A protein has these predicted regions:
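FIC/Doc superfamily catalytic core
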Residues: 1-264
Length: 264
């Protein structure tokens, strides 16, 4: 299982210059956000410079996908040993859904910036098969429509906001909105990771942000998400900083994978 990027796939182009103000730009000035985003970017850059990635990026991405799926499932309460996952002995539907999402991200990178609604539906099908009514797979609830439209505008529109923060907003919106009613957390984390890949934060898909969230703890994750859902300045800032910290931890996990491959 891996996150195979299609040949020729490239990071999303830089946002075009515009005289109109960027409505998301003020988020950088929230307490602690700019510093956290810079630290996350620096952590990813250190990972991307690792010499193993010059010859083994596919292997690192494969391992990253596996560890990311395990951590995403663990955040849902389905915590299984990595060794069992490698052996293929795990049948838990939450874990299987997380594995399918991780494995499917690479094929979605090019479509995500153009047709995010289509990709979100596919992510839910992957995550929630065996957990939701087949008729409900890929179909967001009616109440989610207006807010999903806003999210789609965020994903497809230009912004000067760093990619790590755009990924955090995508993740937070989906997790807080829970548009599908099942497996929304797995979908949200998959969409957040996909945003980071597509916007050039981690174009090789070698970091493991899901492990970062898991290492910071389920309680801290839930608390930060509740803060974001509150809509307060402090709550939004707290979520963005939390996501940046998870990204830093995820970069360290990627470095650990690189080192393990280097040792053989």
């Amino acid at each position: 299982m891996s996150i195979p990027l299609r040949p020729g796939a490239a990071p999303a182009p830089a946002a075009p210059r515009s005289s109109a103000p960027d409505p998301l730009a003020p988020l950088l000035d929230l307490p602690g956000v700019r510093e956290a985003a810079d630290a996350a970017r620096a952590g990813i850059d250190r990972l991307l410079r690792h010499k193993v990635l010059r010859r083994e990026s596919a292997g690192v991405s494969t391992e990253s996908a596996l560890r990311g799926a395990r951590a995403s499932a663990a955040l849902e309460g389905a915590d299984v040993p990595l060794a069992e996952l490698r052996a293929g002995d795990v049948t838990d539907p939450v874990v299987q859904g997380a594995l399918r999402v991780s494995a499917g991200l690479g094929a979605m990178v090019e479509t995500w910036p153009r047709a995010p609604g289509q990709v979100l539906a596919r992510l839910h099908v992957l995550a929630a098969t065996d957990l939701a009514d087949p008729a409900a797979l890929g179909r967001p609830a009616a109440h989610a429509g207006p807010r999903l439209s806003g999210l789609i505008a965020l994903i497809t529109g230009p912004t000067t906001l760093p990619a790590v923060l755009v990924a955090a907003l995508v993740h937070g919106e989906l997790a807080a909105l829970a548009p599908f009613g099942t497996s929304d957390g797995v979908v949200a984390r998959g969409a957040g990771r996909l945003t980071g890949i597509a916007r050039g934060l981690d174009p090789k898909a070698v970091s493991v942000p899901e492990v970062g969230f898991a290492e910071l703890g389920r309680e801290a994750y839930g608390s930060a998400l509740a803060g974001y859902a509150s809509g307060t300045e402090a709550g939004v800032a707290g979520w963005l900083v939390h996501c940046c910290r998870a990204t830093e931890h995820g970069a360290l996990e990627g470095l650990a994978i690189c080192e393990s491959l280097l040792r053989g």
